[in-house]
Amino acid sequence: MQTIDVLIVGGGVIGTSCAYELSQYKLKVALLEKNAFLGCETSQANSGVIHSGIDPNPNKLTAKYNILGRKIWIEDWFKKLIFPRKKIATLIVAFNNEEKLQLNLLKERGIKNSIPVENIQILDQQQTLLQEPFINPNVVASLKVEGSWLIDPLIATKCLALASLQNNVAIYSNKKVTKIEIDSDDDFLVFINNETTPQFKTKKLIDAAGHYADWLAETTQVDNFKQTTRKGQYLVLKNQNNLKINTIIFMVPTIHGKGVVVAEMLDGNILVGPNAVEGIEKNKTRSIDLDSINQIKTIGKKMVPSLQFENSIYSFAGSRAIDIETNDFVIRTAKSNPNFIILGGMKSPGLTSSPAIAKRAVELLNLKLKKKINWNPNYNLSWI
C-alpha cells in the first residue's frame, strides 16, 4: 500500500489542474483515473471554449471562477503550457425583438462579470452581417464579446498531466476507485478495481470524479450532495465549401439553452452543438441519438443556413455534472470531513474555471506548503 500526501480521484481537466497546481510543492501527490486515458469523459466532449464570462449568473460560483480561471489561463498558464489555441470573439445572435431585449440583459450581466465595457457591444443587423457574412439574414441584432479562446480540451488536459509528471506527480490510469474507508488515524484507505485490500493511503483527498463525485463522497460517508446529468451532443462538419466562421456563434442562451454554438475548430472543421438533455443515466452520457442530431441540425441551420450537414464527419456526446441543490459548482470540504475536498457540479464553465478551482482546492487542503526549488511549470505540446 502506497502512502500519499494528497490523492486526486479523477483525471479530467479539473483533476489534472489540481495535479499541476500541487506539483510545485514538496508533497507526494498521486492522481487516479478509472479509464485507460485521461480526459476522455466530460473534458473531451465539450466545446473547448475559454469563455469570456458573459453567461454565468453574477451571484453564482460559476461566474466567480469563470473570471478567475480565465485570468489565470491567459496571464499565467498559456505562457507556461504551450498547445494549440486561438483567440476569438463570441457573437450571440437575436432573431426577434424579444431576443434582442435579452442581448441588453446579457450585456449588463457581462459587465457585472468584469468584462471590460470596450470588449462588449451590441451590433445591429448590418453590423452583424458584416461580422458574419454567412449568418442567417433574418438576424435582427447580436451581442459581440471579445476575449474568448478556442482550445482542444483533451490536449490541454494532456499538457497539464505531462507537466505534472515531469514534476514527480504520479498519475495512474485504469485505477477505478471502488471503495474508500477511513481508519482509526483518520487516513483514507483507497480500494481499487474491487480489490479486497487498499492500494493507497492518504491524509488528504480531492474528489474530482466528475459525474461520480457525489457517489465517491457518499460511499466514503462524508457527504450527501447529489448530481444529475445534462447530456449534450455535437456534430462536426468537414468545411468543404470554404465556409468562413469568424466568431463563436451562439443563440440567445436565456431562451434556447446555453451552449449551442457554431464555430470553426482549430483544425478548420465546423463544430455545431451541443443540445441539452436532462437526467440521462450516467453510463449512457456518451451515447448518440438521432433526435439530438436532428435538433442540432435545426438550430445550426437557423444560425447559419449554408451549413452542409451532408459533410458531417462524426458526432460525439458528453455530459455536464449538475448539482441538484444549487445548479452551481460545488467547491468545498465535505460536510463531515475537512480532509475530503469536493469538486462537484462541474458544468460549463468548468474548463475555463479549472485553474482557479485547482488553486481553491489547494487552499482547502489546509496544508503547510513548501515550494520546490526545481519546479518546472513549462511544457510544450505545440507540435500536436
UniProtKB/Swiss-Prot annotation:
Its main location: cytoplasm. One of its GO terms (biological process) is glycerol catabolic process. Its cofactor is FAD. Its EC number is 1.1.3.21. It is found in: Cytoplasm; Cell membrane. Catalyzes the oxidation of glycerol 3-phosphate to dihydroxyacetone phosphate (DHAP), with a reduction of O2 to H2O2. The formation of hydrogen peroxide by this enzyme is crucial for cytotoxic effects on host cells. Does not show any dehydrogenase activity with NAD(+). It catalyses: sn-glycerol 3-phosphate + O2 = dihydroxyacetone phosphate + H2O2. Pfam families: DAO (PF01266). A lipid is attached at C18 (S-diacylglycerol cysteine). Keywords: Cell membrane, Cytoplasm, FAD, Flavoprotein, Glycerol metabolism, Lipoprotein, Membrane, Oxidoreductase, Palmitate, Signal, Virulence. This is Glycerol 3-phosphate oxidase. Disulfide bonds: none annotated. The active site is at H51 (proton acceptor). Residues 1-17 form the signal peptide. GO terms for molecular function: oxidoreductase activity. PANTHER family: GLYCEROL 3-PHOSPHATE OXIDASE (PTHR42720:SF1), GLYCEROL-3-PHOSPHATE DEHYDROGENASE (PTHR42720). InterPro entries: FAD-dep_OxRdtase, FAD/NAD-bd_sf, G3P_Oxidase/Oxidoreductase. One of its GO terms (cellular component) is plasma membrane. Sn-glycerol 3-phosphate binds at S47, H51, K258, R320, S348. Pathway: Polyol metabolism; glycerol degradation via glycerol kinase pathway; glycerone phosphate from sn-glycerol 3-phosphate (aerobic route): step 1/1. It is a lipid-anchor. Gene3D superfamilies: D-Amino Acid Oxidase, subunit A, domain 2, FAD/NAD(P)-binding domain. The keyword NAD does not apply. Monomer. A lipid is attached at C18 (N-palmitoyl cysteine).
